[in-house]
Swiss-Prot record:
Post-translational modification: Formation of the three residue Trp-Tyr-Met cross-link is important for the catalase, but not the peroxidase activity of the enzyme.
Region described as Disordered: 1-35
Catalytic activity: H2O2 + AH2 = A + 2 H2O; 2 H2O2 = O2 + 2 H2O
Residues that coordinate or bind heme: H275
Family recorded in the similarity comment: Belongs to the peroxidase family. Peroxidase/catalase subfamily.
Coiled coil: none
Record cross-link Tryptophyl-tyrosyl-methioninium (Trp-Tyr) (with M-260), residues: W106-Y234
Subunit (UniProt): Homodimer or homotetramer.
Protein name from the UniProt record: Catalase-peroxidase 2
Cofactor remark: Binds 1 heme b (iron(II)-protoporphyrin IX) group per dimer.
Native source organism of the sequence: Mycolicibacterium fortuitum
Residues at the catalytic site: H107
Length: 733
């Protein structure tokens, strides 16, 4: 009988090589290094396969029909009952969970940043790392557990994304506030989003990297992070770097909320309105335990364990109750703020906060639990709402006109929780308001064209004298402004409006004659075709010409739909954030951009919602179509420009070509004949990425194969159509 094997505990196994005094520790799989640990500068292609179907436990992905079947009235009744059903394991402050849910919703939606459209509450990221463990989200793990009975009961009729955001909205209604409405329709993702750059700091509440080189200028916060400290949704409530300077705090507030696409009125409304409810928690000096992501198994996903509960709860370390009625909507936040002079004090946990001078209002404020009394307190950032000249002018008016505060808060709150949802065509449910706002990027519903109309218009475009390059480029420029992060941009006819008309990437001088010709065709047609449809249809005509020239007969799909947005329906300042800093698909690099072009390409592909194969085939096709910015020959690896061939990949993978940096040292490369040394091609960093990166080269080789010529055309058409329809949420209905 063989001797039974013995094994050391997991993580402690060792191998002793023969005649070696240097044991090699074998790590368990969870501790193994990744490719990115070895090669941290490699492009991250994982972000091009976000939330893949393989990890989605639902049968067919997000079920909008199930959401539409939700009995909203019954659901609201159940939710309202939950609000005041205090649980011993996490008692409700003042007998009402409403303020906790407002904070949860606010902190979910408030991660949005307008710079790249990432963040927000639209994909249910708050339960996942890193957000679930941010210091600013202490105790929100409990808020989500309180909601579990509702989620369990209603299942796929309401996503976690919707439930988390809805909770704050309905809670405020239950506490007497009239909201502007609510839209369901947020899908759940099943893994953390790893394409969001939150900052470079390696410690919670760090700020040194995001202000590197700022020399004390708080407006020079690194982009795109929107908050001054790692792990904060907004600003440090104690003041910048913990310094209780409310005027300096106002600078941070304006910068941070501006990056959330909020103006001064919206910012003031959100702070004043939000702080009408509830309290902060810092009643003792006990320390929180570890965050949820690092907590021991037996805590079952909850974190920050400590003995404090009820009146002894500790979260932020600040102990502030703003009003006498923390579960009721009124104007008392401003009334208290302006009726007292304030002096600096410390919370029991040692945090900087403010109380009325001369011990005013002592023993007149409710405690979270029981009948005890305390005094009002304010955060440093609350005082910014009074003493900053701009915020002060706004809030002083609201002090005397509370109805205006209510109106502005309703609008700002609705914007906060819907900003990342995209167009109103994605809004579901009976609570959607009829009113629309400029920030929603409204595009009027369009007319469905008949097959005869489409054929007539295609013929007119084909006979217009516009080249394949002009047609393809214009369609790409219009559609490629789309970003899947907040579902903004895309077509809609805005390519001829400011600011897009003036973007460097769109080559205004080259664009003008194309716009004029398409408008001429539109005016001559009695079909009612929109300019937006003509732009896409022009791309179809150009592609089909290029496909035919390559010897194939492949139709390019087209579905008519959207009408044209008007200039007055376009927020120029907000749309300016959609301007690409680089577009590797057309070999465009913005002047002065310090980010390598290949990183910009991956980011652009990610924002377009493309997979790595789709990105690859589009690059190869656009190069041979001559679609480069400025007519550049970089990466145009064909002598048959305008034909949709796989020449790009054939020549890119040709070992008869030797590549070297161009003599000008301008980030471009020259390909020479390996035998003769004669120059053959020029290319960009983006182009060589598809020959040098192991994964992308594998894809390039597929399209370079002799039997892939037709596959290449069909795959290009499919990827092209995906980009053209990226903003067509009406097609998903």
């Amino acid at each position: 009988m063989a001797e039974a094997e013995t094994h050391p505990p997991i993580g402690e196994s060792q191998t002793e090589p023969a005649e070696s005094g240097c044991p090699m520790r074998i790590k368990p799989p969870v501790e193994g290094g990744s490719n990115r640990d070895w090669w941290p500068n490699a492009v991250n292609l994982k972000i091009l396969q976000k939330n893949p179907p393989a990890i989605d436990p639902s049968d067919e992905g997000y079920d909008s029909e199930a959401v539409k079947s939700l009995d909203v009235e019954a659901f609201q009744r159940d939710f309202d009952e939950l609000l005041t059903n205090s649980q011993d394991w996490w008692p409700a402050d003042f007998g009402h969970y409403g303020p906790l849910f407002v904070r949860m919703s606010w902190h979910a939606a408030g991660t949005y940043r307008v710079e790249d459209g990432r963040g927000g509450g639209g994909r249910g990221m708050q339960p996942f790392a890193p957000l679930n463990s941010w210091p600013d989200n202490v105790s929100l793990d409990k808020a989500r557990r309180l909601l579990w009975p509702l989620k369990k009961k209603y299942g796929k009729q309401i996503s976690w994304s919707d439930l988390i955001v809805y909770s704050g909205n309905r809670a405020m209604e239950h506490m007497g506030f009239k909201t502007a409405g609510f839209a369901f329709g947020r899908p759940d993702y099943w893994e953390p989003e790893e394409d969001i750059y939150w900052g470079a700091e390696a410690e919670w509440l760090g700020s040194q990297d995001r202000y590197a080189g700022a020399n004390g200028d708080r407006t020079k916060l690194e982009n795109p992070p929107x908050x001054p400290h790692m792990g904060l949704i907004y600003v440090n409530p104690e003041g910048p770097e913990g310094n209780p300077d409310y005027l300096a705090a106002a600078i941070d507030i304006r910068e941070t909320f501006g990056r959330m696409a909020m103006n001064d009125i919206e910012t003031a409304a959100l702070i004043v309105g939000g702080h009408t409810f509830g309290k902060t928690h810092g009643a003792t000096d006990i320390e929180n335990g570890v965050e949820p992501e690092x907590x021991p198994l037996e805590q079952m996903g909850l974190g920050w364990a400590n003995p404090g509960l009820g009146n002894d709860t500790v979260s932020s370390g600040l102990e502030v109750t703003w009003t006498q009625h923390p579960t009721k909507w009124d104007n008392s936040f401003l009334e208290i703020l302006y009726s007292n002079e304030w002096e600096l004090t410390k919370s029991p946990a040692g945090a900087n906060q403010w109380k009325p001078k001369d011990n005013g209002w002592a023993n007149s404020w409710p405690m979270a639990q029981g009948t005890g009394k305390t005094h009002p307190s304010m955060l440093t950032t609350d005082l910014s709402m009074r003493f900053d000249p701009i915020y002060g002018e706004i809030t002083r008016r609201w002090l005397d006109h509370p109805e205006e505060l209510a109106e502005e808060y309703a609008k700002a709150w609705f914007k906060l929780i819907h900003r990342d949802m995209g167009p109103v065509t994605r809004y579901l449910g009976p609570l959607v308001p009829k009113q629309t706002w400029l920030w929603q990027d409204i595009i009027p519903a369009g007319k469905q064209l008949s097959d005869a109309d489409v054929a007539t218009l295609k013929a007119a475009i084909a006979d217009s004298g516009l080249s394949i390059q002009q047609l393809v480029n214009t369609a790409w420029k219009a559609a490629a402004s789309y970003r899947s992060s907040d579902m903004r941009g895309g077509n809609g006819g805005r390519i001829r409006l400011q600011p897009q008309l003036g973007w460097e990437v769109n080559e205004p001088e080259e664009l003008a004659p194309v716009i004029a010709k398409l408008e001429e065709i539109q005016a001559a047609s009695d079909s009612g075709v929109s300019f937006a449809d003509l732009v896409v249809l022009g791309g179809v005509v150009g592609l089909e010409k290029a496909i035919k020239a390559a010897g194939f007969d492949v139709a390019v799909p087209f579905t008519s739909g959207p009408r044209d947005a008007l200039q007055e329906q376009t927020d120029v300042d907000s749309f300016a954030y959609l301007e690409p800093k680089g577009d590797g698909f057309r070999n465009f690099v913005a002047k002065g951009d310090s980010v390598p072009a290949e990183y910009r390409l991956i980011d652009r592909a990610n924002l377009l919602g493309l997979s790595a194969p789709q990105m690859t085939v589009l690059i190869g096709g656009l190069r041979v179509l001559g679609a480069n910015h400025g007519g550049s020959e970089l990466g145009v690896l064909t002598d048959k420009v305008g034909q949709l061939t796989n020449d790009y990949f054939v020549n890119l993978t040709d070992m008869g070509t030797k590549w070297a940096p161009a003599p000008a040292d301008d980030g471009t490369y020259v390909g020479t004949d390996r035998a003769t040394g004669s120059p053959k091609w020029t290319a960009s960093r983006v182009d060589l990425l598809f020959g040098s990166n192991s994964q992308l080269r594998a894809l390039a080789e597929v399209y370079a194969e002799d039997d892939s010529k037709e596959k290449f055309v069909k795959d290009f058409v499919a990827a092209w159509t995906k980009v053209m329809n990226a903003d067509r949420f009406d097609l998903e209905a």
